[in-house]
Each structure stands twice: as structure tokens, then as C-alpha cells.
């Protein structure tokens, strides 16, 4: 301790010692203050904070509590950092040397004090180092990128517009709107906090006060922002938070992050924080203690797996310098394109080549006929386009023969060279080819051939008389012929079907008036596509009465093109009708889940064999007898039931949910009906709507077993096929573990049955699976809660790495989500449950940094083929595909991207 004369030289009378040890630093709980109080409390003193760790002690802080001015505060953070590194100023050096003799006494005092008090409960897995805390301090933000960062000129402009009728005063209720903040509740609390800090009274502010408020909001200094945040709940400014204020801060954060479950459980979580920071039941906690808990690093339930050096090397490899030679850049780009798309390239080349060959053949054939002398090149073009139309009208049916494609991709090796994943896209490309062909064919006839026939003289027309009959001068006679009527009819019907099949109409993206809106959507697309029954009938008739051909019907080629595809497609439809009606399925369980999702558990027919990632069609005759809708199967192949999760969006799904919701409603007490739609607990068999299924059908995600490492990405309801894959991996892990246990048993060692070749081919290959599920609603995590918990219980070898992202929560590092992050770590450490998802899997906030995700996988798995499987909205497809190609080109890891048609 300093003697009195030494203290007087510095201008102070007493010294108060505060110690920091591993017990009270960020590695455990709140600070513990040990006071050496040799004189009266009213006399001046100096506070010295000592950092005691094992046998080492260092000065951590120095200040005069009785002198709060800027000149008397020695606890500047930069000064302390210098002091700890040997670069302190003279005052700190003198104090450090003077107190060195009292360090041992203080340390022993702290140890004895700690021994007398009951130890605070230690939370396993809650750890932070000072470096991580400093990073958190620098990165913590108060306002997100979308709230309040529009810039002062915009805020000022809005202020003047909003205060035109209020004499230049902005009311408290419109403060959030003025600064561009969406959360009204958060904006009101922010206004009150800033008003207290700036000593502003009343519920209105002028432009100068708003500018001061704006400076506080946009201040990049962490301390200022954190003080503002705590001022929002510490309304009496005493530096203490009681349980009610802690509850308010939790409610405030939950409201800003749209987390209704946390808001409803605010009392429980407030009690949890008080239990941690107020073990002696003083009834309050200090704000600085809550700051320590806020800075706890979120627990990581996964291993990073890469070092800084590897990460740096990879970053350097990804920065490929651009060649100045345009030829070299073009060649490299073409090389990458062919390498990534060679399956699509050869299929498209074959298709385009076939069309070009047919067009050229017919063009040259009619170039030599007498019709060329009358109608010229127009008839050659019309007949060439007609031949391509025959091919395309036949081929467009093949990509939608789902049973055939499923059999080919599952039972044959053709998937190695044929891009079955692009079957629907190829269907659309052929439709475009048909549109172009129809345009050329119809225009050539209507705008060129018919006018030339009318204008031809008798000698020119004579060779055409055997095809068209006596010459007519009326244009309408050609249009009203069988060929003309059937052709125009096909064009009209195809135009309707093609238009309603476009994304704008099929997904109701156009803002149409009420009456017109009813003729758009999936139902309009579904029913309009059935017009092709009429189209193909007209096509056969049109081909029978085709112009310029008078041979018998069996020598005409239209029916030859169509016969095989049409018969194949009709067989597909018959198989669907037969398969769905032979063995009916019963509903085992129904649940209406948060986020407008209907979960159905159905009995599994004995002959229904499928793979994870595949889908099936559902039909509910109570809604519509004709409509069949595809849904991914969420159960695993090893389960004894079938499950689907249906997002309620369109008319059909809304009616389906309404029907099942009626079944789930509780009956009056006298009817003795249990309030749950689970057949295992029913007192009687409920009257569920009849469900028919058809499938399974192949999908891109079913190929996950071809890869040892897979990256599964699901957006919202797009997680459904990925959940089936995760469940399948769990079942396989259980099977491998059970097999290992059997081999280790003495009985198994006595008799070991041989493994068949088929069993060897089905060996489980997946060694690592990364699952990223991104959803906006917190309630979405309830959909697959059981699966998430099962992963944490079963996956002892860490094969599956789960990442749940809730985008409604502000990004990590924002003050409004800092409370959620702290609460998340605290609750998970104590109860093993994540407060956001309600599962044992820790959730992340905002959206993933996909480049970092790919970078991490590339570092962890060099020279490996990684299967990337995505299902969700189309907005993310481009980014994931680009990253897959980019990392495949620039690293030794090859990412193979698969997109589910969603």
C-alpha cells in the first residue's frame, strides 16, 4: 500500500483497490471489488483495479471516483492498454511501483473473501478472451444497415415535410418514421433515452435537437452506443437494472427482432439473467455486469476446421489476376463453360442439330417442287418450320414423363451423361422452340403463301389446283379450310397455355384487377395445360389434311412423330391413376404448424420405395378431383410412414388446411374427443379427407449419396427435401453403429454372414454433411424440431453440421440482437436449448455469408467433390451456382451444384 505522504504527492488521500481475477473476469461472472478502507468513506480516495491471474498481478484500472471530470479520470482505455504493455505515463508508473508492496496483501484478501462467499454458479461453455471482447466492442452496431442510415440530408428533408403543420416540432410518435427506423417500439424507447441524455423535456423536438439525436445514433464509438442502449431501460439512470428493467430490455430486443416466443417468455429469461448476475438476491444487477455477459462469445457447436494460414492462402488463390489478352480470357471462359455444362451442351447441340437437319431437308425438298414456282421461298420456310414443329411437339412430352425419367436416373447409368435435373428446363426450352416454329410457319403461310396463291395467274396456279382446288380470290377461303381452322385453333390454345404458364401468371406476380386475378395462379396454369389434349387432337387432324401432300394417311409423318411420346405419356397417366387407387393411404397424424404450414403423416404402402430428396404428388378429392400437387417427402426411407410439409400459399393448399383444421378442432366435452389429430391417441376413427398419392419421382437431391461431402441449403419450406436427407443420414449412422456393435459382440465373432455385392454397393458413403436452413419466421423451427434434436443426440461422430439462420433477427453485432445472443448462450449453456429455435441446435442471425461458407468447406475438404443441393426461392440460385463454379475453378475442391425445381 502507498503511505500517506505518497498519496498526498498525487493529490489523493486514500486508495481503493479493485481486483480482477479469473473468477470475476470475462471467464466467469461479474467483477468483485475488494476495498481497502483505512479512512472514512467521505474522504478522497483512488480506485485501483488489479488483474490477478494465478501468481501474476497487474494494474488494470485507475481512477478517482470522487472526481468525475475529464481531467481526473485515469481509466482511459487506451491509457490502460499502454500501461499493461509497459508504456504507461509517469503517474501510472509511480502508482504501479508504489502499490507493488500491497499487491500480495490485496490478492490474499481477495482469495479469502472469495472463500468466505458462496461460489457463483459457473456456466460451462461460456468463455471469452479479452481479444474477442475487443472485437465485439468494435463490431457492435446500434443501427442496422436498413434502419437509420439513410444519411442526415434525407432525415432533415423528412423532418421538414413532417413538421410543416407543427411549427417545426417533431412529435415523439413520428421519430422512428423520420429517421427511417421500422420498429416503432424500439424508436420510442430510443427517443426517450436520447431525450434523457440530452436533457430534453416534452414529447417534441426541433431540428437542432434532432440533429443532436442523429449524432448520437450514428456515432461509431461503441461506448456511446452501448450507453444509449442501456439508457433505454435504465430510466432512473442509477446504473442498476432490476428484474422489471431486465424484462423490458428482453422484450424490447425480442420485439425489434420479431421473436414472439422470446417476448412471451420474457419473465422466464429475465429470471435466468438475475439468477446469473444476482446470486445473493440484492434485487438488482449492475449495468457493467450485464455488459460482461453481453460480451460472452456465442457458443460454437461446430469446429472451425481451418487455420488462419490456410484461410489466407485460399484467399490469395481466389484472387486470380485477369489476363489482358482478350483471346486468353475468352478461351479460359469457354473452357470453364464447357467443363461445367458439357451435359447440357451436347443435349442442346443434338436437339438444335436435329432441328437444323429437318428444316434443311424439307427446305431443299420443296425447293425442287412446283409449289416453289408459285409461292417461292415462303413455302420452303413454312414446310421446314412445320417439320421442326412435329419433332418438338413429340419431344415436349418426354421431359414430363416422370416415371420414365425416375426409372432411368435410378436404375441406369444414363444420369452420368444426361442432365435429368434439367428436364423441366428442357421442357421450357422446347416450348420456346415450338413458339418460334409456330410463328415462322404461320407467318409464312398467312403473310406470303396465301397472298401469292390469290395473286397467281391461271398458268402459274394450274399445278396447285390438285392441292387447293379451283383458284379462289378470297383470302378467307384459305383461313376457313380444315388446315386453316385447325392451325389457328392450335395457335390460340397454345398461346393461352404458354401465357398462363409463365412465371408472372403462374406465381401471381402481376398486380391485376380482381376479376382478372382469378384467372391466374397455379390453378389456371394446371387447367390450361390440359388444353393440350385438344391441341394434339387438332394437330393430328391438321397433319392429315396438310397442304401440298395428297399421299395416303399412313405415308404422312405427323402421327409417326407423335405416336411413341403420346402413348408413353398416356401410360404415365394411367399408371398414376392405377397406382394411387390400388392401395389407399390413411392419415396418421395432422399438425397445423407456425408459418402457415400443414404437416401430414400418412401410412406407407408396402410397395412404396423411395430415396431421400424425392417427391410425390398428392390429391384430395374433397378439394379437387383433378388437381395433383407435388410435395417433397420429408420422412426418411427407413421410416414406416410418409410425411410431407405443405406451405399454405394457393387456393388448393388453403382449402386443404381448412379441411384438416376442422378435423383438428376439439369437440364438446360430452363427445369425449381428444384435442389432437393423432390416430394413435384417438378414441374413434376421425373422418379425414381422402388422400391419394402418386410417386415417388426423382429429384436432384436424391443424388446426395454420390458424394462423401454434401452442402445442403434450404430456404424456408425449401428445407423439406434436405430434412429427409438429414433423417436418412441419421438412420444410416444408427445402422453403422449397430453393425459395429454386432461385430464386436462374441456371438457375431463366431458366425459372420457374408456381405452380398448388392449390400456393398449400398454402403453409406456420406462422411460429412453441412446443412444450412435459412428462414424468416422463428416459428418455422418448430417444423423439424424433433429431427434437429435427434441429430444432436445421435451424431456422435459429428457427421452432420447444422446451421439454422433466422433472418428476422438483426445481424450478429447489432445491439438489438446482442441481448438475444447473450440470452441464447446463457440458456443453451444452462438448459441445452436454443431460445430462438427451441431446439438443441444453436441458431445464427441474419443471412449466411455464402462465400465464407464455401471457403470454409474448400479448406476443410481439399481435392474432394462436394455436392451442393439447394431448394428454395430462385433468388439465391445465381449466387450459389456462381460460388460453386468459382471455387471449383480456383481451388482443388470441386463443388457440383444441384437446384431443386421449386
Curated annotation (Swiss-Prot):
Q: What is its EC number?
A: 1.11.1.-, 1.6.3.-
Q: Where is this region: EF-hand-like 1?
A: 163-173
Q: Which residues lie on this side of the membrane: Extracellular?
A: 366-380, 450-484, 551-709
For the modification Phosphoserine, the affected residues are: 311, 315
Q: Where is the composition biased (Polar residues)?
A: 74-87
**All residue ranges annotated as the EF-hand domain in the record:** 221-256, 265-300
For side Cytoplasmic, which residue ranges?
A: 1-344, 402-428, 506-529, 731-902
- Which positions fall inside the Ferric oxidoreductase domain? 383-540
Q: What class of enzyme is it?
A: oxidoreductase
Protein topology in the membrane: Multi-pass membrane protein
Indicate where this protein is primarily found: membrane
| Segments traversing the membrane | 345-365, 381-401, 429-449, 485-505, 530-550, 710-730
Segments of skewed composition (Low complexity): 107-116
Give its localization.
Answer: Membrane
Region annotated Disordered, chain positions: 63-87, 107-130, 738-760
Chain spans, region EF-hand-like 2: 198-209
Keyword annotations of the record: Calcium, FAD, Flavoprotein, Membrane, Metal-binding, NADP, Oxidoreductase, Peroxidase, Phosphoprotein, Repeat, Transmembrane, Transmembrane helix
CDD domains assigned: EFh, NOX_Duox_like_FAD_NADP
- GO CC, any one term: membrane
Instruction: List, alphabetically, the InterPro entries matched.
Output: Cyt_b245_heavy_chain (IPR000778), EF-hand-dom_pair (IPR011992), EF_Hand_1_Ca_BS (IPR018247), EF_hand_dom (IPR002048), FAD-bd_8 (IPR013112), FAD-bd_FR_type (IPR017927), Fe3_Rdtase_TM_dom (IPR013130), Fe_red_NAD-bd_6 (IPR013121)
Molecular functions per Gene Ontology: calcium ion binding; oxidoreductase activity, acting on NAD(P)H, oxygen as acceptor; peroxidase activity
Q: Which family does it belong to?
A: Belongs to the RBOH (TC 5.B.1.3) family.
What is this protein for, i.e. what is its function? Calcium-dependent NADPH oxidase that generates superoxide.
Which PANTHER family has this protein been placed in? Answer: NADPH OXIDASE, RESPIRATORY BURST OXIDASE HOMOLOG PROTEIN A
Q: How does it assemble?
A: Monomer and homodimer.
Q: What is this protein called?
A: Respiratory burst oxidase homolog protein A
Organism of origin is Arabidopsis thaliana
Q: What is the lineage of its organism?
A: Eukaryota, Viridiplantae, Streptophyta, Embryophyta, Tracheophyta
Amino acid at each position: 500500500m502507498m503511505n500517506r505522504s505518497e498519496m498526498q504527492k498525487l493529490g489523493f488521500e486514500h486508495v481503493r483497490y479493485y481486483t480482477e481475477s479469473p473468477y470475476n473476469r470475462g471467464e466467469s461472472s461479474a467483477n468483485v471489488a475488494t476495498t481497502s478502507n483505512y479512512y472514512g468513506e467521505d474522504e478522497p480516495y483512488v480506485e485501483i483495479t488489479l488483474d490477478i491471474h494465478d501468481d501474476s498481478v497487474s494494474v488494470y484500472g485507475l481512477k478517482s471516483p470522487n472526481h468525475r471530470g475529464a481531467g481526473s479520470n485515469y481509466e482511459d482505455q487506451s491509457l490502460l492498454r499502454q500501461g499493461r504493455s509497459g508504456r504507461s505515463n509517469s503517474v501510472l508508473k509511480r502508482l504501479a511501483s508504489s502499490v507493488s508492496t500491497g499487491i500480495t496483501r490485496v490478492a490474499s484478501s481477495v482469495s479469502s473473501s472469495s472463500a468466505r462467499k458462496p461460489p457463483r454458479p459457473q456456466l460451462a461453455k461460456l468463455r471469452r478472451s479479452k481479444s474477442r471482447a475487443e472485437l465485439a466492442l468494435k463490431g457492435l452496431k446500434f443501427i442496422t444497415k436498413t434502419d437509420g442510415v439513410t444519411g442526415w440530408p434525407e432525415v432533415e428533408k423528412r423532418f421538414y415535410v413532417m413538421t410543416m403543420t407543427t411549427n417545426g416540432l417533431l412529435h415523439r410518435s413520428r421519430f422512428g418514421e423520420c429517421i427511417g427506423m421500422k420498429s416503432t417500439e424500439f424508436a420510442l424507447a430510443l427517443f426517450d433515452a436520447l431525450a434523457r441524455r440530452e436533457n430534453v423535456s416534452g414529447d417534441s423536438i426541433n431540428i437542432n435537437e434532432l440533429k443532436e439525436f442523429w449524432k448520437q445514433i450514428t456515432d461509431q464509438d461503441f461506448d456511446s452506443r452501448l450507453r444509449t442502449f442501456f439508457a433505454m431501460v435504465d430510466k432512473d439512470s442509477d446504473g442498476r437494472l432490476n428484474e422489471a428493467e431486465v424484462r423490458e430490455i428482453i422484450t424490447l430486443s425480442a420485439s425489434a427482432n420479431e421473436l414472439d416466443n422470446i417476448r412471451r417468455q420474457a419473465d422466464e429469461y429475465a429470471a435466468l439473467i438475475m439468477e446469473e448476475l444476482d446470486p445473493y438476491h440484492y434485487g438488482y444487477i449492475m449495468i457493467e455486469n450485464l455488459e460482461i455477459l453481453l460480451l460472452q462469445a456465442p457458443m460454437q457447436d461446430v469446429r472451425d476446421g481451418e487455420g488462419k494460414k490456410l484461410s489466407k492462402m485460399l484467399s490469395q488463390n481466389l484472387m486470380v489476376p485477369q489476363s489482358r489478352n482478350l483471346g486468353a480470357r475468352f478461351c479460359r471462359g469457354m473452357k470453364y463453360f464447357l467443363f461445367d455444362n458439357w451435359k447440357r451442351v451436347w443435349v442442346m447441340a443434338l436437339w438444335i442439330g436435329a432441328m437444323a437437319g429437318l428444316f434443311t431437308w424439307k427446305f431443299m425438298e420443296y425447293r425442287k417442287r412446283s409449289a416453289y414456282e408459285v409461292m417461292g421461298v415462303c413455302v420452303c420456310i413454312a414446310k421446314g418450320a412445320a417439320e421442326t414443329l412435329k419433332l418438338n411437339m413429340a419431344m415436349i412430352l418426354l421431359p414430363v414423363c416422370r416415371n420414365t425419367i425416375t426409372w432411368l436416373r435410378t436404375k441406369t447409368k444414363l444420369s452420368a451423361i444426361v442432365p435429368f435435373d434439367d428436364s423441366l428446363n428442357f421442357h421450357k426450352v422446347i416450348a420456346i422452340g415450338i413458339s418460334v416454329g409456330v410463328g415462322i410457319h404461320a407467318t409464312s403461310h398467312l403473310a406470303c403463301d396465301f397472298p401469292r396463291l390469290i395473286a397467281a395467274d391461271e398458268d402459274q396456279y394450274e399445278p396447285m389446283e390438285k392441292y387447293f382446288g379451283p383458284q379462289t380470290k378470297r383470302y378467307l377461303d384459305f383461313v376457313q379450310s380444315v388446315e386453316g381452322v385447325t392451325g389457328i385453333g392450335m395457335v390460340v390454345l397454345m398461346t393461352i397455355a404458354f401465357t398462363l404458364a409463365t412465371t408472372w401468371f403462374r406465381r401471381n406476380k402481376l398486380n391485376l384487377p380482381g376479376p382478372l386475378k382469378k384467372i391466374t395462379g397455379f390453378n389456371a396454369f394446371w387447367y390450361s395445360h390440359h388444353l393440350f389434349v385438344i391441341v394434339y387432337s387438332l394437330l393430328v387432324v391438321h397433319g392429315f389434311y396438310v397442304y401440298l401432300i395428297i399421299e395416303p394417311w399412313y405415308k404422312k409423318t405427323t402421327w409417326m412423330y407423335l405416336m411413341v411420346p403420346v402413348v408413353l405419356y398416356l401410360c404415365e397417366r394411367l399408371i398414376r391413376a392405377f397406382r394411387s387407387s390400388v392401395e389407399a393411404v390413411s392419415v396418421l397424424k395432422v399438425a397445423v404448424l407456425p408459418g402457415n404450414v400443414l404437416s401430414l403423416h400418412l401410412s406407407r404402402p408396402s410397395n412404396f420405395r423411395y430415396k431421400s430428396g424425392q417427391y410425390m404428388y398428392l390429391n384430395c378429392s374433397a378439394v379437387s378431383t383433378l388437381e395433383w400437387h407435388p410435395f417433397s417427402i420429408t420422412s426418411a426411407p427407413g421410416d414406416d410412414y410418409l410425411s410431407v410439409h405443405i406451405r399454405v400459399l394457393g387456393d388448393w393448399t388453403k382449402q386443404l388446411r381448412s379441411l384438416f383444421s376442422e378435423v383438428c378442432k376439439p369437440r364438446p366435452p360430452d363427445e369425449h374427443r381428444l384435442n389432437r389429430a393423432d390416430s394413435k391417441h384417438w378414441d374413434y376413427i376421425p373422418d379425414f379427407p381422402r388422400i391419394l398419392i402418386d410417386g415417388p419421382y426423382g429429384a436432384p437431391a436424391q443424388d446426395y449419396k454420390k458424394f462423401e461431402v454434401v452442402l445442403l441449403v434450404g430456404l424456408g419450406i425449401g428445407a423439406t427435401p434436405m430434412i429427409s436427407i438429414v433423417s436418412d443420414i441419421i438412420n444410416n449412422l444408427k445402422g453403422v453403429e449397430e453393425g459395429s456393435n454386432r461385430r464386436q459382440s462374441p456371438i457375431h465373432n463366431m458366425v459372420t454372414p457374408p456381405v452380398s455385392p448388392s449390400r456393398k454397393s449400398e454402403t453409406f458413403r456420406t462422411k460429412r454433411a453441412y446443412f444450412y436452413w435459412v428462414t424468416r419466421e422463428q416459428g418455422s423451427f418448430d417444423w423439424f424440431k424433433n429431427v434437429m434434436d435427434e441429430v444432436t443426440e445421435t451424431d456422435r461422430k459429428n457427421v452432420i453440421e447444422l446451421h439454422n439462420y433466422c433472418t428476422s433477427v438483426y445481424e450478429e453485432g447489432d445491439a438489438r440482437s446482442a441481448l438475444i445472443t447473450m440470452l441464447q448462450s446463457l440458456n443453451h449453456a444452462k438448459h441445452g436449448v436454443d431460445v430462438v429455435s427451441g431446439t438443441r441446435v444453436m441458431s445464427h442471425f441474419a443471412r449466411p455469408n455464402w462465400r465464407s461458407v464455401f471457403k470454409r468447406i474448400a479448406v476443410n475438404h481439399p481435392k474432394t467433390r462436394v455436392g451442393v443441393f439447394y431448394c428454395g426461392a430462385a433468388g439465391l440460385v445465381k449466387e450459389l451456382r456462381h460460388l460453386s463454379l468459382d471455387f471449383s475453378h480456383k481451388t482443388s475442391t470441386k463443388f457440383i451444384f444441384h437446384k431443386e425445381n421449386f
